[in-house]
C-alpha cells in the first residue's frame, strides 16, 4: 500500500499543480514527506525491537580466565580466551582444541555436511582443508556430543563463518502468516479501490465535470480508501508485544510465534526447573543398606568415601562466588559435599578429602559424557594409585550393570534380592517426589567408552528434592481455564513424575501415566486414540517426544513443547511453538526453539500465551479501526457522487484525516493492555482469519454510522454554502474517527474497559483533536485546507454528530454483553 499511496499522491500533486492550485500541491507534497518519515520511523522502531530481541536470545559461553570458570555473553569472547565446550553448545568463535573428551561437532552450517565430525586435540601437520582440520572448531557449529576446551583464535567477522557472511547479502526478513494474509487482502482491496475510482471517474465525466475535477475526485476517493498504515501497524504491534513478553521472561525469536501463541491448546512441559524450582537439595543417602543424612556420612569408611569421590569428581559443575555453574543436579552434589566440609572439616583434612584438594590433585583421564539415551555419566581417575571408572545415573539403568556391591566388609557379588531391595527403596523415594541418582565404580585398566560401562560395584543412592514452584499450581489451573491441556514430560522415574504432577494439578484421578517403554509398545493409532487421557510421560526419549507432538497435532491441536537438551531440538522444531530453557537450556535447543524462557518457568509460558492472545486481539481491533474509518470515507464520497452533490472532501482533507487517524490512534489500540478475560476464552482456531464474516459486518456497520454522521453534517452545511458543507463534513469525519478509536479498544463497552486503562488512547485522541483545532481555528490555514470559518452553532453540531456513532456503538456493545 505504501508504494501505491506514493504514486497516487504524486498524481494528486501533479493534478493540483497543473490546475494552478499551488497551496494544495505544497500540502500534498508535505504530507508525502511526512508519510515517508513516519513510515521510516515505524520501520526503524520495528527493526530495533526485533534486533533487541535477537540480542536477548544470543548465546552465552563458559570460559576460563585466570583459572576461574565464568559464564559470559558470547560477544565478550576475545582471541586468547579458553572456552569450555559441552554437548548442546553452539560454538561462537573459531578455536584450536586444547583437550578433547569424545568431542563430536556438527559443522553443516559451514561445510553443508550433516554428519557429526569427531574432533581431537592431536597436532596435525601440513596445510589441510578446512573440513579436515580435526583439531579446530568453527563458529556456527554445534557440539553434539562430548566435551572439550578450546583456545579462541578468531571472533566475529574474522571467523570462517564471518568471512562467508561478508560475501552474502543479509537475508530478507520473512513475513508472518498474518502479514502475508493481509498482503493478499491488500492486493485485492487495491484492485477493488481502483475499479471503484474508475467508475466514479466515469460518473463525474457523465455529469459533465471537467477532466481535472473528475481526476481529482477519483484521486480523493483512492486516498480515502487506502489503509496505508496497515502493514506497519501490524509489525509494530507484534514487536511491541514481543518486547512486553521479553520483560516478562519470554523471549520470542520470530514474530510468527506471536500469532501461534494465541492458538496453543496443548503445552507439553518438562518437569525439572520448569514446573519445579530446579533447586536440588540432597535429602537422604542410601548406602550399605542404611539411610543417612549427608552430615552423618563416615568419611573414614571406604564405601562412603568412594560415593563422595563419585559425587564430586564425576561432576562437571562448579561453584564460583557461591553461585553454581552447570547442571543443578550436579551442583546439589557439590553443595552436599560443602555441607559435609563445614561439619567435618578436621576429618576431611585427615582424609585429604576437601573438594578443592580433590579436584586439584585428581586429574580426569577419560570420560563418557551424560546423554539422554544412556542416562549415565562416567569418568576415569587414578584413585589411590589404581585407575578407577566412576559412574552415576538412573537407578534402573545403572543397577542392571552392577555385578558387585561394596559394604563394610569389602566387596562381594550382588544378589537379585539386593537389587530388588534397592529398587524398592528407589520406589519409596520416588513416591515422595524425590529425584534419585545411583552411584557405582570399577577399577579397570581398559579404555573408557560406552562398552566399558558394565561390571560395576554398586555404592549407593542419593535422593534429592526439587520442590514445585510456588506459582506452578496456579499456572496449571489458569491453563486449564484457558482451554489449554498441560502435559508433563520428564526423564525422571514415573512414580516421581506422578507425585509432582498430582501436587500441582496436572495429574487427576482417571488420568494415565506412561513410561517411554510403554509408549514404544503402542502404535501411532493407539497413541492418538488414548493421548487425551495421558497427563504424564516418564523416562521418555527424544523420539518419544516427537511422537507425542505428532499425535496431538493429528487431533487438530496447536502444540507447545519445552526442552533443554541437544536431543530435544527435533521435538522443538516439530512443535508449533518450541520453547527452550534460558538457564539450563543448551544452545542447540535455543537455536531450534521459537521462544526462550529466561526464567525456565511454566508460569511464564501461560503469561506468554495471554500476551500472544492480546497481541492478536489488538491487531484485529487496530485493523477494524483502520478499515471501518476508511469505509466511512469511501461511503461518503460514493454517496455524494451518486447523488450528484458537490465533492465533500479535497485530497488535502483526506490526506489530513488519514495522517491524523491512521497513525497514533491505531498504534494506541495496538497497545491495549491484557485483561483477565483473555485466559477465560478457548484457544483461537488457527484456520480462522481476521477478516471473517462477522468482522466484515461490524466494519461496514461502523463505517456506515460514521459516514452517516459526516453526511448529515454535510447537508446541514450545504444549507449555508458548499464550502460550509465541505468544512462540516471534513471536521465531523475527522472527529468521529478519533472518537471511534475508543470503540475499537475491545469488544466490550468502554465503561467496562475503563477510559484511563489505556493512556496511549487518551494521548492519541488529545493529539488528534489538538491538530484538528489548529486547522479549524487558525485563519491562515483555512485557504490551505479549503475550509470555511465555523460559527459556534456549527461547532456544537459537529461535536454532537461526531459523538453519535460512538454512543450508538457503545449502546450496542452494552446490549450484546448483557
Describe the predicted segments one by one.
Residues 1-680, 690-691, 704, 715, ...:
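Conserved cytosolic headpiece of P-type ATPases
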Residues 661, 706, 727-741:
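Generic alpha-helical transmembrane segments
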Residues 684-703, 723-724:
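Membrane-water interface at loop-to-transmembrane-helix junctions
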Residues 709:
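C-terminal catalytic subdomain
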Residues 744:
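Hydrophobic, aromatic-rich cap/lid helix
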Amino acid at each position: 500500500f505504501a508504494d501505491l499511496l506514493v504514486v497516487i499522491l504524486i498524481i494528486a500533486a501533479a493534478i493540483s499543480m497543473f490546475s494552478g492550485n499551488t497551496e494544495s500541491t505544497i500540502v500534498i507534497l508535505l504530507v508525502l514527506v511526512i508519510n515517508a518519515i513516519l513510515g521510516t520511523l515505524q520501520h526503524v522502531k520495528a527493526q530495533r525491537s526485533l534486533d533487541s530481541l535477537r540480542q536477548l536470545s544470543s548465546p552465552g559461553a563458559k570460559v576460563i580466565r585466570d583459572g576461574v570458570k565464568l559464564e559470559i555473553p558470547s560477544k565478550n569472547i576475545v582471541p586468547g580466551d579458553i572456552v569450555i565446550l559441552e554437548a548442546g553448545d553452539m560454538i561462537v568463535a573459531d578455536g584450536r582444541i586444547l583437550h578433547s573428551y569424545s568431542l563430536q561437532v556438527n559443522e553443516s552450517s559451514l561445510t553443508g555436511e550433516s554428519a557429526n565430525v569427531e574432533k581431537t586435540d592431536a597436532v596435525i601437520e601440513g596445510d589441510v582443508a578446512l573440513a579436515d582440520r580435526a583439531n579446530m572448531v568453527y563458529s556456527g557449529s554445534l557440539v553434539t556430543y562430548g566435551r572439550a576446551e578450546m583456545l579462541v583464535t578468531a571472533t566475529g567477522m574474522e571467523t570462517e563463518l564471518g568471512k562467508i557472511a561478508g560475501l552474502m547479502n543479509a537475508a530478507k526478513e520473512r513475513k508472518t502468516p498474518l502479514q502475508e494474509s493481509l498482503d493478499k487482502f491488500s492486493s485485492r482491496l487495491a484492485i477493488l479501490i481502483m475499479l471503484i475510482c474508475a467508475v466514479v471517474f466515469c460518473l463525474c465525466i457523465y455529469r459533465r465535470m471537467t477532466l481535472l475535477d473528475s481526476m481529482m475526485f477519483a484521486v480523493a476517493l483512492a486516498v480515502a480508501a487506502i489503509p496505508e498504515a496497515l502493514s506497519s501497524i501490524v509489525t509494530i504491534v507484534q514487536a511491541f508485544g514481543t518486547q512486553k513478553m521479553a520483560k516478562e521472561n519470554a523471549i520470542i525469536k520470530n514474530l510468527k510465534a506471536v500469532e501461534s501463541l494465541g492458538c496453543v491448546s496443548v503445552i507439553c512441559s518438562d518437569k525439572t526447573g520448569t514446573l519445579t524450582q530446579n533447586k536440588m537439595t540432597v535429602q537422604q543417602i542410601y548406602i550399605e543398606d542404611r539411610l543417612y543424612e549427608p552430615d552423618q556420612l563416615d568419611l573414614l569408611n571406604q564405601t562412603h568415601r568412594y560415593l563422595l569421590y563419585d559425587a564430586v569428581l564425576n561432576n562437571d559443575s562448579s561453584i564460583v562466588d557461591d553461585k553454581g555453574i552447570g547442571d543443578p543436579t550436579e551442583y546439589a552434589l557439590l553443595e552436599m559435599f560443602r555441607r559435609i566440609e563445614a561439619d567435618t572439616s578436621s576429618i576431611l583434612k585427615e582424609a585429604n578429602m576437601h573438594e578443592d584438594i580433590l579436584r586439584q590433585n585428581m586429574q580426569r583421564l577419560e570420560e563418557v559424557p551424560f546423554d539422554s539415551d544412556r542416562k549415565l555419566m562416567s569418568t576415569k581417575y587414578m584413585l589411590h594409585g589404581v585407575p578407577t571408572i566412576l559412574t552415576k545415573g538412573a537407578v534402573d539403568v545403572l543397577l542392571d550393570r552392577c555385578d558387585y556391591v561394596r559394604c563394610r566388609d569389602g566387596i562381594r557379588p550382588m544378589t537379585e534380592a539386593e537389587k530388588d531391595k534397592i529398587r524398592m527403596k528407589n520406589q519409596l523415594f520416588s513416591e515422595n517426589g524425590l529425584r534419585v541418582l545411583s552411584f557405582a565404580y570399577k577399577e579397570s585398566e581398559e579404555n573408557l567408552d560406552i562398552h566399558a560401562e558394565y561390571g560395576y560395584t554398586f555404592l549407593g543412592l542419593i535422593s534429592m528434592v526439587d520442590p514445585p514452584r510456588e506459582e506452578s499450581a496456579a499456572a496449571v489451573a489458569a491453563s486449564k481455564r484457558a482451554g489449554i491441556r498441560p502435559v508433563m514430560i520428564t526423564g525422571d522415574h514415573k512414580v516421581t513424575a506422578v507425585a509432582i504432577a498430582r501436587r500441582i494439578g496436572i495429574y487427576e484421578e482417571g488420568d494415565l501415566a506412561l513410561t517411554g517403554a510403554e509408549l514404544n509398545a503402542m502404535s501411532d493409532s493407539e497413541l492418538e486414540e488414548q493421548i487425551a487421557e495421558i497427563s504424564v510421560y516418564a523416562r521418555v526419549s527424544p523420539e518419544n517426544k516427537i511422537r507425542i507432538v505428532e499425535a496431538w497435532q493429528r487431533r487438530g491441536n496447536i502444540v507447545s513443547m519445552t526442552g533443554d537438551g541437544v536431543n530435544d531440538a527435533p521435538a522443538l522444531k516439530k512443535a508449533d511453538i518450541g520453547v527452550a530453557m534460558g538457564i539450563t537450556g543448551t544452545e542447540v535447543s535455543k537455536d531450534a526453539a521459537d521462544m526462550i524462557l529466561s526464567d525456565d518457568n511454566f508460569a511464564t509460558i501461560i503469561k506468554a500465551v495471554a500476551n500472544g492472545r492480546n497481541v492478536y486481539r489488538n491487531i484485529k481491533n487496530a485493523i477494524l479501526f483502520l478499515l471501518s474509518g476508511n469505509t466511512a470515507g469511501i461511503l461518503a464520497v460514493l454517496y455524494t457522487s451518486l447523488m450528484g452533490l458537490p465533492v465533500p472532501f479535497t485530497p488535502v482533507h483526506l490526506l489530513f484525516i488519514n495522517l491524523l487517524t491512521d497513525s497514533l490512534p491505531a498504534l494506541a489500540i495496538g497497545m491495549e493492555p491484557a485483561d483477565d478475560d483473555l485466559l477465560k476464552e478457548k484457544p483461537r482456531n488457527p484456520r480462522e482469519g481476521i477478516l471473517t464474516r462477522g468482522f466484515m459486518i461490524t466494519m461496514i456497520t461502523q463505517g456506515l454510522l460514521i459516514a452517516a454522521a459526516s453526511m448529515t453534517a454535510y447537508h446541514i452545511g450545504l444549507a449555508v454554502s458548499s464550502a460550509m458543507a465541505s468544512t462540516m463534513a471534513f471536521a465531523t469525519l475527522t472527529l468521529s474517527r478519533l472518537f471511534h478509536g475508543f470503540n475499537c479498544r475491545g469488544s466490550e463497552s468502554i465503561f467496562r474497559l475503563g477510559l484511563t486503562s489505556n493512556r496511549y488512547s487518551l494521548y492519541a485522541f488529545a493529539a488528534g483533536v489538538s491538530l484538528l483545532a489548529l486547522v479549524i481555528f487558525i485563519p491562515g490555514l483555512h485557504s490551505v485546507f479549503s475550509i470555511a470559518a465555523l460559527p459556534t452553532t456549527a461547532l456544537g453540531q459537529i461535536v454532537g454528530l461526531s459523538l453519535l456513532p460512538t454512543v450508538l456503538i457503545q449502546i450496542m456493545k452494552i446490549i450484546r454483553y448483557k
